[in-house]
């Protein structure tokens, strides 16, 4: 397995008095600004999550480096008596509004406890910003207006984690990927299903999309173009030994063609991964407009060796490349962002990922040509 050279590598969050988990990354192209979010915890365990923190980075095109400002707490992203988890940033380019979605869970109630008792106490929350994350609105609890009575049909749920998606349709639809453990039968354990929260009015109101197949958990979505047709591609964690994917022809409302992606292996309990779409940089006959990039641990036994995978035929689950290594050793969750053209003329990406035994969250920049040079050699 080849190892990818990188343009920059820097630790943004390091475990000490507090632990940090669950990275989320957003690139604001016009501002040349990166926003790196994470959960700040009293310890590494989920039950000890506390707050969501942010570091702001300024990208310098001349040096191809990002200068990061100190950590700050997103103080508005707190529901009283609850811990804030699973940061999911989303930027509406049309209204220039930044949303930060997350879940709020009371006290030290664990996901396992909710699955065991089948009592859902998780809340869907959001804050927004009109100045690129410098100041934030008061918290909105969207649970009743968005989920309503369906909330009690779930044992628990979560969003993301990681970046969300604005579609290129006329409405500029906003999609927040999510999953819910549904209580389908009193005698059975709750089963996880991925789906999307959808807004057609720039975040004023939200609705539930329909579910992907069962055994789909933490997920991300990307918009892919196949000529004149657009599809929403969903890639989800599973317990099946490999990722699962599905596609939506109607902007995230319904998903179809659910497939296990055998080339994208999962460790025994699965792990979060990240996917982004980007414009095909090579003009070839019959080439698709959009390619996909995906990051995830490459070992089927453990969360180790972070790899990046390329798919030049996005809807074909067999078309994923072999991985190129981004980082050796223990790793876990990651989040990708497309940062436009890199210094070598190929697309450039930022990646924020968990390293070591959740000791660090590291940011790095690499280009497509660095990760997959043979794609360009074939031109």
From Swiss-Prot:
What is the reported tissue distribution? Highly expressed in heart.
Q: What is this enzyme's EC?
A: 3.2.1.18
Alphabetically sorted, this entry's keywords are: Carbohydrate metabolism, Cytoplasm, Glycosidase, Hydrolase, Lipid degradation, Lipid metabolism, Repeat
State any single GO MF term.
exo-alpha-sialidase activity
Q: Which InterPro entries does the record associate with it?
A: Sialidase (IPR011040), Sialidase_fam (IPR026856), Sialidase_sf (IPR036278)
**Binding residues for substrate:** 21, 41, 179, 181, 218, 237, 303
Q: Which Pfam families match?
A: BNR_2
| SUPFAM superfamilies hit by this protein | Sialidases (SSF50939)
Q: Where is this protein found?
A: Cytoplasm, Cytosol
Which sequence ranges are marked TM in the entry? none
Residues forming the motif FRIP motif are 20-23
Superkingdom, natural source: Eukaryota
Supply one GO BP term: oligosaccharide catabolic process
Q: Name one GO cellular component term.
A: cytosol
Show the catalytic activity. Answer: Hydrolysis of alpha-(2->3)-, alpha-(2->6)-, alpha-(2->8)- glycosidic linkages of terminal sialic acid residues in oligosaccharides, glycoproteins, glycolipids, colominic acid and synthetic substrates; a ganglioside GD1a + H2O = a ganglioside GM1 + N-acetylneuraminate; a ganglioside GM1 + H2O = a ganglioside GA1 + N-acetylneuraminate; a ganglioside GT1b + H2O = a ganglioside GD1b + N-acetylneuraminate
CDD domains xrefs? Sialidase_non-viral (cd15482)
The residues annotated as the active site are: 46 (proton acceptor), 303, 333 (nucleophile), 354
Q: Where are the BNR repeats?
A: 127-138, 197-208
Tagged with keyword Transport? no
- Name the protein family: Belongs to the glycosyl hydrolase 33 family.
UniProt function note: Exo-alpha-sialidase that catalyzes the hydrolytic cleavage of the terminal sialic acid (N-acetylneuraminic acid, Neu5Ac) of a glycan moiety in the catabolism of glycolipids, glycoproteins and oligosacharides. Recognizes sialyl linkage positions of the glycan moiety as well as the supramolecular organization of the sialoglycoconjugate. Displays preference for alpha-(2->3)-sialylated GD1a and GT1B gangliosides over alpha-(2->8)-sialylated GD1b, in both monomeric forms and micelles. Hydrolyzes exclusively monomeric GM1 ganglioside, but has no activity toward the miscellar form.
Its name, as the record gives it, is Sialidase-2
Species:
Mus musculus (Mouse)
Q: What is the lineage of its organism?
A: Eukaryota, Metazoa, Chordata, Craniata, Vertebrata
Q: Which gene encodes it?
A: Neu2
